[in-house]
Amino acid sequence: MEIHHQLLVSLLFLLLPLCSSQENTRSLAIDVNGPVETSPISEKLNPKLVYEIKVHGFMLWAAMGVLMPIGIISIRLMSIKDQPIITLRRLFFLHVTSQMVAVILVTIGAVMSVINFNNSFSNHHQQLGIGLYVIVWFQALLGFLRPPREEKARRKWFVGHWILGTSIAILGIINIYTGLHAYAKKTSKSANLWTILFTAQLSCIALVYLFQDKWSYIQSQATFNRNQSVDHNSNISTAETGHGYEVEESKPELEKC
């Protein structure tokens, strides 16, 4: 009887590790198949997913952080007066091309997000991203439906196009910051360097944007100062020439004396 009791106790001790290992395995499976927020360890151990996140972020940065500002600045440069027609055409072509490439990159980034990432739309980055994607495509279609200048609808179209473009620029910048935060949260890697670099880039873009409004004034002032200096030099040369004539006219009188 005691032997049977000892065998039963030994079997219990042998079965306990097996039960605990099965429980750990099942908990790991639940963690892997669970939401992204509750299992960051599985994502950190997946280099392919980290690479896809980086590609997604780079494409959206190129679209919203580079091409969209280029399109805005190029179209604003067209408002400078007295520009050659060829310059205006090049600026308009730059505006259209940059915006079309930006729309393509946004679309590819959105498709990558749907296919590769867990899109539960439970965080601000995903929610803002889907809304931004819809606005970007609506703005692109609105750009192709531009009415002629002589039509009355052109003014309403311009106001709507400007409002949508400004909204896309602001929301795109915000979504880049939220994307950097989401990247740091998912991969447990610091995104402070990228945040600082993007902030510095935004500061440079803002300076260029504010400076271009004053560029025409600076050019007009430079032209005015140059004309003034030319007039001043011509007046001095005229005065010196007149003074030379007076000296030569006074020479015969001095010789008579």
Swiss-Prot record:
Residues 235-257 are annotated as: Disordered. GO terms for molecular function: metal ion binding; transmembrane monodehydroascorbate reductase activity. Residues 1-21 form the signal peptide. The keyword Signal applies. This is Cytochrome b561 domain-containing protein At2g30890. Binds 2 heme b groups non-covalently. The keyword Lipid biosynthesis does not apply. It is a multi-pass membrane protein. Heme b 2 binds at residues 95, 161. Keywords: Electron transport, Heme, Iron, Membrane, Metal-binding, Signal, Transmembrane, Transmembrane helix, Transport. The chain crosses the membrane at residues 55-75, 91-111, 125-145, 157-177, 191-211. Residues 243-257 have a biased composition (Basic and acidic residues). GO terms for cellular component: membrane. Pfam families: Cytochrom_B561. Coiled coil: none annotated. It is found in: Membrane. Heme b 1 binds at residues 56, 125. It comes from the Eukaryota. Residues 22-219 form the Cytochrome b561 domain. Its cofactor is heme b.
